[in-house]
Amino acid sequence: MALNNFSIVFPGQGSQYPGMLVQYIENLPLFKSTFDKSSDLLGTDLIRLLKQGSKEDLSKTEITQPLMLTSNIALWNQISSLVEKPICLAGHSVGEYAALVAADVLSFEDALSLVIERSRLMQAAVPMGEGGIAAIIGLEEININKICSKISQNPDYLVSAANLNSYNQIVISGTKEGINKAIQECKSSGAKRAIPLPMSVPAHCMLMKGAADKFSDSLDKAKFSEPKIPVILNVDSLLETNPERIRTKLIEQIYNPVRWLDTIKSMTEMKVTTIIECGPSKVLCGLIKRISSEIKTIDLDSFDNYLNLSNAERV
């Protein structure tokens, strides 16, 4: 039975893991060809990295971001001919670039070049070990914002909400000292958990403003077209059709929070009933289930799920 009222979402940094999607690479020539193209452009053998690289190797921002774009688009190329046109698309953080490729706003080659430069600038913006991120579970956004605002009065302790992921999960980003202080204060204020996360870059906070300003030059050189599929953007969780405004919002996205909760709310208002996560892992499916029990989720991390989707769409 064909899918109806569905959308597709693309995961970002944090969903990668060693050995991911290997069954796709070994069984689907079209899928493998996307990795081959990226490997040539990057000068790095991504397939070997997936098969032999460690978790730490895959967690380096300058590797992770192009790797996630490649993985997401390899899957999109595989399923786009199987399914009808989705109601809309969205991507989490760097996953937004995959959504824009799928919507024909950017070519894959331009998106890959942009993501490589984006990751380089973000990595260079804060010296290694001086920034951090943490997940706060079970504390309301208003309380987290108050805590972060208070701590950030000292510029050495800059910290703010970076990913508004669900009703009870918010990721904060900032200086290492700011993160450590925020973790303690969030716990004292009733957070169920406050966990530092292994990320080399404190994304989506004002520490990235300088990187965003430099990145604007690269975005100005890329060709942007009107989306052929509606895309909900991270910065404001709204649909955007104007190529120049999309370009501007990609700059803003680097130092502003990802509004994932509001993105899924927007999809429910558009009568989306099924969401396919087009990338490795099941992180976004997990978040979506916590936001709405009414939405069915399908992850493509499992090769069997892809085969089931493929067979169902041919019926």
List where the protein language model places each region.
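FabD-like malonyl-/acyl-CoA
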Residues: 2-146, 274-307
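Alpha/beta catalytic cores of group-transfer enzymes, especially the acyltransferase/condensing modules
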Residues: 13-15, 42, 103-255
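A short, flexible low-complexity segment enriched in Lys/Arg and Gly/Pro that occurs
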Residues: 67-73, 253-260
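NAD(P)-dependent dehydrogenase/reductase Rossmann-like domain
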Residues: 178-179, 218, 271, 294-295, ...
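Short glycine-rich catalytic loops that host catalytic nucleophiles or stabilize transition states
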Residues: 197-200, 268, 301
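Short hydrophobic/charged patches on amphipathic alpha-helices used for structural packing
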Residues: 261-265
